[in-house]
Every structure is written in structure tokens, then in C-alpha cells.
């Protein structure tokens, strides 16, 4: 059996007195395009936070590349990038500086700090911003002065510049119009790269819109901190969805 890229074994997470994840087991293999479904409060954000190491499980084990997460070095952890639902942009920086923050994942803080504000280091950031349909006119603008949809795409470009193997995304299509949603979804689920940039080969994206399921090959449904179904996209039926909505 091929080892998964990322694995949870009987993971539970406790927030105060409540379990927001309850004995969740999950194996993510290379090349999978996974949609994570469930109502607000189902545990999707907690699951993503456990998968990327932001939260430590109350019980259970998390492995990346068959290695316990707490034993990984900085470079190994950088193989996972995340698009957060609340974006987590730095308001005192420009759009291009925020994108460059994605480089923090692979570099020491001192190196990144010295180069973050260096204009000559923005070429790569601009490339990823353009792929995310951001116009040159907003590159140097303070993040406070751009629209919600533009901020969303800055956060996406920041995750892509990290050039990770695995992308975790929490509702990444909020604030995007239908055309941009389609373009960005195709970018995140890409199988043939026409833009000559590195895009993660493996993705897990939480969604609430069922009309966005095209392009995914695996669907996971959550409710009350538990996985109620985990199946191939072709096997998804209405009764599965009725379990979680």
C-alpha cells in the first residue's frame, strides 16, 4: 500500500468542553482533488487547522510524508500551504508585500524580513498575482484600499507563491463573482499547467456551494465534528448530502 501524503489517525480536538473533531481518520494521497462539505460549525476549519499543524490534536496522530507532524523541519512543513477563510492578510503591508509573505514558509524569518520589502524581489509575486487575475494597478496598494474580492485573490496568490505540494483552502471562493470563481477554481484544481507556475498537485478545499463540485474526484462530508461520508465524486448521491445538510 502506498503511504499517503497526509494522514490523520483517530484525531479529536477539544475546544473548552466541546469536541469540534471527534475520532477523525483521514488519508490524503498525491494527486487527489478533495471537496470538504458541511454546514458552518461542522468542523471543517478545525480539520484544516489540524492538517496544517496550526492546531494540535487533543488525541490522535497527524503524519505528513509518513512522519509525525511535530518531528518535521521547516522545509517539510512548507510542503503544505493554506488559504484561510478569514484571509489573515497584514493590513500595514501592500498587496505585493502580502503575497511575498508566502515566502516565509521556506525561509528563515531574518531572510524573509530583509527581502520582503525589496522591490527587486517582487517579480515572482507579480507573476502569481497576474495568474490570479489581479491588475498591476493594485500591486503596490495598501491592502486596506482594495476590494474584498481583490483581497481574496491576494491571499490565494500568497498561498501559491509558497509552491507547496498540498493546498488546503477554507472557502476560498468567497467574495468572488461567478467568472472569477470559475477561473480561480480551475487554477487550484489544475492538472495541466499553462501558466508555467508551480501549483499544488494535491488539494483539499472546503465548500458550501454544491454547484462547484465539478473538477473534484473525492468528496468528504462532515457534521458535528465527524466525517459522515468519504467517497469518489461519481458515487455522491442526494442521500449523502441529506446527512450533512
What residue ranges belong to the model's regions?
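The feature captures the beta-strand-to-loop junction immediately N-terminal to the Walker
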Residues: 37-39
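ABC ATPase NBD coupling module
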Residues: 68-84, 118, 238
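Conserved ABC ATPase signature
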Residues: 142-146, 150
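Helix-to-loop junction immediately C-terminal to a conserved catalytic motif
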Residues: 52
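Hydrophobic anchor residue at the start of the ABC signature
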Residues: 156
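Catalytic Walker B motif of ABC-type/P-loop ATPase nucleotide-binding domains
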Residues: 167-171
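Helix N-cap at the start of a conserved alpha-helix in ABC-type nucleotide-binding domains
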Residues: 178-180
